[in-house]
């Protein structure tokens, strides 16, 4: 009994509910003005029905949002006539009835300010066709009168919608930028965390025969061809010795006087006025460490009382205490000085003698 009674109650409520086109605020011959929040007269907006035997629909065919649900006029029902253009039809043969619309029970009493009633429009129906079928009312010329003055409410939708579109676009661009930043960070960060000074002959654990040292060693004026291939073949072996020097400070070289003297003999000399171009001297090494050419010129002016290489190492250690021997090995490899790399590897060798 309980579910059946609830279902019956719901059906009764649906039957008593007003149709969707009926206004919840105004009487039958009025319509709700959503802009002014009041009830306006259908007659004051559309004028009298333009064709004989037509009357106003309920609420002029407008809903409470100001949208047209049906045309404002409809043909009188059977036995009803309206020859004088009244608001509603009346029984044929009787006098025209002028209704006095009033708000229903519970409806708002607010009414809009009265306006002049427009003149009666021209009836588009021909004398030979005094009426049109009800199925054609929506597309008939008479029904088009209802659309002469649409409500301006829908025109305000786009300006209110524009800030939301701009906000969505900005949020989308921000999310894309964040995702790109995260992607680049994940791609580049592991490379930065890897050893910033890779050793010659080793690229990802595989011997590399295309290091800059090969091109420099085979260039004119560097070394003889036989010595070039001999020293280039030593690079993979030297890399194992240099790998132990990766974390050792560069200042250690100042204490290893024997190794330092050998490097001075190899790197400090420059060719005379008639010599060829020098490759991989102390002057080039200073440029790798970011020192200006004026500093190199001043350091070379102190020869022979002071070695430019020793002055360079002291300058780098003072300016960057974290400088390592591995960084020096990388610069020597980029300059193509395999002979200097062989001398530097003595600091990492344990009882190994190089011929």
Swiss-Prot record:
Subcellular location: Cell membrane
Residues that span the membrane, as ranges: 164-184
UniProt biased composition (Low complexity): 132-144
Side of membrane Cytoplasmic, spans: 185-355
Conditions for induction: Up-regulated by the pro-inflammatory cytokine TNFA and in skin upon tissue inflammation.
Keyword Transmembrane helix annotated: yes
Residue intervals on the Extracellular side: 23-163
Origin: domain of life: Eukaryota
Segment forming the signal sequence: 1-22
Membrane topology: Single-pass type I membrane protein
Coiled-coil regions, chain positions: none
Region (Disordered): 120-147
One Gene Ontology cellular component annotation held by this UniProt entry: plasma membrane
Keyword Glycoprotein: no
Entries under PANTHER family matching the protein: IGF-LIKE FAMILY RECEPTOR 1
Role: Probable cell membrane receptor for the IGF-like family proteins. Binds IGFL1 and IGFL3 with a higher affinity. May also bind IGFL2.
Protein name as annotated: IGF-like family receptor 1
Gene it is expressed from: IGFLR1
